Structure formats: C-alpha cells, structure tokens
Amino acid sequence: MGQKVHPHGLRVGVIKEWDAKWYADKKNFADNLVEDHKIRNFVKKNSYAAGVSRIEIERAAKRIKLNIYTAKPGMIIGKGGQGIESLKNKLQKIVSNKNILINIVEVKRPEADAQLIAENIAQQLEKRIAFRRAMKQSIQRAMRSGVKGIKTACSGRLAGAEIARTEHYNEGTIPLQTLRADIDYGFAEADTTYGKIGVKVWVYKGEVLPARKNINEKEEANA
C-alpha cells in the first residue's frame, strides 16, 4: 500500500528551507534537539488561539532566535508588548543560560496556509460542525485566495461512525512528485467525544523556478 512522503521534508534543500537553522557537534546535538522540541510545543500550546503556522529556530553561541509565523500577531505581542515579554520569560525557564530573541512574522493569507487550514477544520470538528461542510468551506476559501490546488483528508470516527475511515476532498491540482512545486502541508488533530480525528491538508501554490542568470551581464563581467 502506497504511503505519502512529507512534502516539506522531500523539498528541503531544493525549494524549502530548514525550520531549525543551527549546527551542533555530537556532544550537544541531542540536547539542542530536545530543547527545540520543548520550545515548539510550548509556543504552540501557549499561543494556539493566535494561529501559529510554523516556528523557525536559529541558534548562535549563547543566543536563540525564534521566528514565529502567526495569523494574529497582536494576540502574541499583547498590549504594549506585554504578551511577548511574558512568553520570553516563560521560555527562559525551558532554555537555561541562553538569551532568547522573539521575532513575530505575520501570515498574510491564513486561508492559504496548510497548517492554519488544518487547525481551523479541527476546531470546527470539535464544535460538532459536519466534517464535509468544514472541509468544503475551507477548500472554497483557499481557492478564492488564489492557490492552484488543495486537498484535505479527515481520518477517524467521522460523524460518530462505529468504524473509522478516511475521507478526501480536493480541488485543483496537487503535483506531489514535482520537486519544484511549492506544496504546503499541515496536520492537526480534533479531540471529539468519539475520539481523535486527524486532519491533513496539502496546498499547491505554484511552481518555484530557479532564478535565470543574465548571460549579457556575465559576459560584461568577464570582459
């Protein structure tokens, strides 16, 4: 039975970048990795209502910089920057002897962001909204925002059924095997009275073509 590779992992180094931008030797690698995991989990849990799409972590000697991509930056920053200071102080307890810098980046089109779409569908399922309706509405909003294609999948005891199943809905094209295709992927879980329901979303935003070198400029430089 065919399984799908993670679209982001497949394209790292081709058209996608790492979410963790640091290097460590064997001695410190495991500690840094666990620290990253704790930071991501804490920020996600603490700022779930703000719609956190992804978190980039950059490390220097005694400094950690977090780039938090969110649909509602005001909710994280808070009044007069109080929210961001509170978050920094809480993170400082997780990360020992390191200075934390937090940079908030606004997600301009949350209706076209795969992670935020998945979380939105999951939230609707928890509010007992029909899964088909939640999926179709999200697809319509995404297509209106200008994406080339979108595919959604819900897995679990849908509508309280005795036997778990998976249902897919898609519109447009999703070229999963094309490496230059900019495909965004998101996953979320809905905690319902019947158990967990997994939500997966793939969004195709178009092709990323390599920058063409200007031959004339190159010739002038050599002359």
From Swiss-Prot:
Keyword rRNA-binding among record annotations: yes
GO annotation, cellular component aspect: cytosolic small ribosomal subunit
Coiled coil, from the record = none
User: What are the BP-aspect GO terms?
Assistant: translation
Question: What are the disulfide bonds?
Answer: none
Ribosomal protein among the record's keywords?
Answer: yes
Which first-to-last residue range defines the signal peptide?
A: none
A Pfam family hit? KH_2
- Give the matching CDD domains: KH-II_30S_S3 (cd02412)
Q: Report keywords, A-Z.
A: Ribonucleoprotein, Ribosomal protein, RNA-binding, rRNA-binding
PROSITE patterns documented for this protein:
KH_TYPE_2 (PS50823), RIBOSOMAL_S3 (PS00548)
Q: Name one GO molecular function term.
A: rRNA binding
Report the residue ranges that make up the KH type-2 domain in this protein. Answer: 39-108
Task: Look up the domain of life of the source.
Answer: Bacteria
Q: Mind telling me which HAMAP family this protein's record contains? A: Ribosomal_uS3_B
Subunit details:
Part of the 30S ribosomal subunit. Forms a tight complex with proteins S10 and S14.
Tell me the PANTHER family matching this sequence: 30S/40S RIBOSOMAL PROTEIN S3 (PTHR11760), SMALL RIBOSOMAL SUBUNIT PROTEIN US3C (PTHR11760:SF19)
Function, as annotated: Binds the lower part of the 30S subunit head. Binds mRNA in the 70S ribosome, positioning it for translation.
Q: Which family does it belong to?
A: Belongs to the universal ribosomal protein uS3 family.
- Under what name is this protein listed? Small ribosomal subunit protein uS3
Q: What is the lineage of its organism?
A: Bacteria, Bacillati, Bacillota, Clostridia, Eubacteriales
The gene from which this protein is expressed is rpsC
